[in-house]
C-alpha cells in the first residue's frame, strides 16, 4: 500500500496538548500572531513542524524514520493578555534534533525558515529552556566571574570601563594615549568601540601595540591590573584568531568580539581559543536591536544572552536601565540573572518563562554602557550589584578637564557608593546626597557633577512584558 499523499493540517501531527515534557527536551516559548482565519492551535503546530521535522505536504520518506521520536511538539498555548490575536505557543524539541556544542545549529532549527512562514503574521522567540544534557556539551564562557576577579585581583565592587571616543578617526598613537589617561585615572578597563576593527586610519596591529604600551605604563603607575578590550572581530575567522594570538603575545588580559555580526561559529571558536590561552573575552551585542526590538517579531534579548553564555563570553552588554539605550528594569534584571546565576527560577514578572539550570557553565558579567555618568552611579550600583562592569564612555572622556580626571571622578563616585551601601545606606533614596558628599573631597567629581547635573534620557521603554 502506498503512503497517503497530500496536505494535512499541522495540528493533527504537531499539536499535542497531552504531551509531558522530558528533562532532556529543549523548550521554547514563541509569541505567535497568526494570519486572520488561522486558529492558534494550527499556528502553534505549524511553528513546531517547520522548526523540526515537518514540511508543507506529506512525503513518502516520512515512513523511513520515526517522526514520533524526532518531531517538535506544540504542547501548550495561552493567549497574551491585552493583545488581540496573539498567543504564547510552547514547543518541545527532542534533544537529538541538535548537534552537540553548536549554537549555530540550534538557532538554524528553532529560529530558521519558520520566521518567514506565510500562515503567521509575526513570530517572536521569547525564551528557551536549555536542558543540562545539552548545556554540558558546551564549554561556555572562557573563564567566568570568579576566575576573572582572581586574574584581576579586584573584589567587592563593580568593575569600571570606558569606551574610547571618538570611536572612529583617531590614529593609533592618539588612541593609545587616551587609553593610558583613562587607566591611569582609576578605571579597570578601556574598550575598543564595536566598529573599530582595522580601518585605513588605524590598522589593528598598530592599535594593539599602542594600547599594550598604555596598559603597562598605567599598571606601573597605579599598582593595579589594567586591561583594554582589543576588538579581534574581523572579516574571516582566521584573521580573528590571528588578532587574538597577537594580543596573547603582547601579554594583555582581554580581547573583544562582536558576537552577532561576527556570528556564533566565530564566537565559539574565539571563546575556545581564549580559554586555552588565558584571555578574557568581552562581548559586544551590536545588531541585537535588529533582532530583539520589535515586540511581536524576532527574538528576545534574553534568548541571545543565553546563547552567548553557551557560545562563550566573559562580559556582555546588557543595557543600563538608566542611560540612553533601551532596557526596562525588571526585564533587564531578568536577563542579568540569566547571565550570572547558576540556577534561575521561572519568573514571568521578569519575562523568564522557564526555570533554567546552568549546571557547571560559568557566569557572564553584565556590562552597563550607554549614556551613563556619575549621577547614575548609585542607581547602577544598586541595580547591577558587584558582579558587573559599569562603562562610562562620554561620562569619562567628556569631563571638562580631560580623560584622567574623568576616570578619577568615576572611581571616586563608585567607591563612595560601594562604601555607602556597605554601611547600610539606601542608594535609591540617598544616591544624590552620597555623590554630593563625595564631591566635597574630589574636585574631579565636583566638576563632573556640575557638567552632567541636568542630563536625562526619558523615553518609554519599548521592551515591556
Swiss-Prot record:
Catalytic reaction(s) noted: 2 (2R)-3-phosphoglycerate + 2 H(+) = D-ribulose 1,5-bisphosphate + CO2 + H2O; D-ribulose 1,5-bisphosphate + O2 = 2-phosphoglycolate + (2R)-3-phosphoglycerate + 2 H(+)
EC number: 4.1.1.39
Pfam families referenced in this protein's UniProt entry, alphabetically: RuBisCO_large (PF00016), RuBisCO_large_N (PF02788)
Domain of life: Eukaryota
Modified residues (N6-carboxylysine): 191
Positions of Mg(2+) binding: 191, 193-194
Active site residues per record: 165, 284
Subunit field text: Heterohexadecamer of 8 large chains and 8 small chains; disulfide-linked. The disulfide link is formed within the large subunit homodimers.
Protein name (database record): Ribulose bisphosphate carboxylase large chain
Amino acid at each position: 500500500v502506498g503512503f497517503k499523499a497530500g496536505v494535512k493540517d499541522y495540528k493533527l501531527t504537531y499539536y499535542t496538548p497531552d504531551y509531558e515534557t522530558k528533562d532532556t527536551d529543549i523548550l521554547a516559548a514563541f509569541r505567535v500572531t497568526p494570519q486572520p482565519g488561522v486558529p492558534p492551535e494550527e499556528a502553534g503546530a505549524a511553528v513546531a513542524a517547520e522548526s523540526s521535522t515537518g514540511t508543507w505536504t506529506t512525503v513518502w520518506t516520512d515512513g523511513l524514520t520515526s517522526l514520533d521520536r524526532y518531531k517538535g511538539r506544540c504542547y501548550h498555548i495561552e493567549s497574551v493578555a491585552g493583545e488581540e490575536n496573539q498567543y504564547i505557543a510552547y514547543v518541545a524539541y527532542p534533544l537529538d534534533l541538535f548537534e552537540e556544542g553548536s549554537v549555530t545549529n540550534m538557532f538554524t532549527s528553532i529560529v530558521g525558515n519558520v520566521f518567514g512562514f506565510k500562515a503567521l503574521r509575526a513570530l517572536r522567540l521569547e525564551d528557551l529552556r536549555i536542558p543540562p544534557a545539552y548545556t554540558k556539551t558546551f564549554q561556555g564562557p572562557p573563564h567566568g566571574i570568579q576566575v576573572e576577579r582572581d586574574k584581576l585581583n579586584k573584589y567587592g565592587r563593580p568593575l569600571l570601563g570606558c569606551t574610547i571616543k571618538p570611536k572612529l578617526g583617531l590614529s593609533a598613537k592618539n588612541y593609545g594615549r587616551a587609553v593610558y589617561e583613562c587607566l591611569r585615572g582609576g578605571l579597570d578597563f578601556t574598550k575598543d568601540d564595536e566598529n573599530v576593527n582595522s580601518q585605513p586610519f588605524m590598522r589593528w596591529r598598530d592599535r594593539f601595540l599602542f594600547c599594550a604600551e598604555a596598559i603597562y605604563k598605567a599598571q606601573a603607575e597605579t599598582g593595579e591590573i589594567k586591561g583594554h578590550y582589543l576588538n579581534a572581530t574581523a572579516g574571516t575567522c582566521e584573521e580573528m584568531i590571528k588578532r587574538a594570538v597577537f594580543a596573547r603575545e603582547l601579554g594583555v588580559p582581554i580581547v573583544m568580539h562582536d558576537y552577532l555580526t561576527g556570528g556564533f561559529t566565530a564566537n565559539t571558536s574565539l571563546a575556545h581559543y581564549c580559554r586555552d590561552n588565558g584571555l578574557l573575552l568581552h562581548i559586544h551585542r551590536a545588531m541585537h536591536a535588529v533582532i530583539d526590538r520589535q515586540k511581536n517579531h524576532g527574538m528576545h534579548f534574553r534568548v541571545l544572552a543565553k546563547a552567548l553564555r553557551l557560545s562563550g563570553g566573559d562580559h556582555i552588554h546588557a543595557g543600563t536601565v538608566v542611560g540612553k539605550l533601551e532596557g526596562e528594569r525588571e526585564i533587564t534584571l531578568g536577563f542579568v540573572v540569566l547571565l550570572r546565576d547558576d540556577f534561575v527560577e521561572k519568573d514571568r514578572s521578569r519575562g523568564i518563562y522557564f526555570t533554567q539550570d546552568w549546571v557547571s557553565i560559568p557566569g557572564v558579567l553584565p556590562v552597563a554602557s550607554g549614556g551613563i555618568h556619575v549621577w547614575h552611579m548609585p542607581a547602577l550600583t544598586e541595580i547591577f550589584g558587584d558582579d558587573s562592569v559599569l562603562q562610562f564612555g562620554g561620562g569619562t572622556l567628556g569631563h571638562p578637564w580631560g580623560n584622567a580626571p574623568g576616570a578619577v571622578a568615576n572611581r571616586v563616585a563608585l567607591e563612595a557608593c560601594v562604601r555607602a551601601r556597605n554601611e547600610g545606606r539606601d542608594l535609591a533614596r540617598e544616591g544624590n546626597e552620597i555623590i554630593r558628599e563625595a564631591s566635597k573631597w574630589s574636585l574631579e567629581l565636583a566638576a563632573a557633577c556640575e557638567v552632567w547635573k541636568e542630563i536625562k534620557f526619558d523615553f518609554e521603554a519599548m521592551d515591556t512584558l
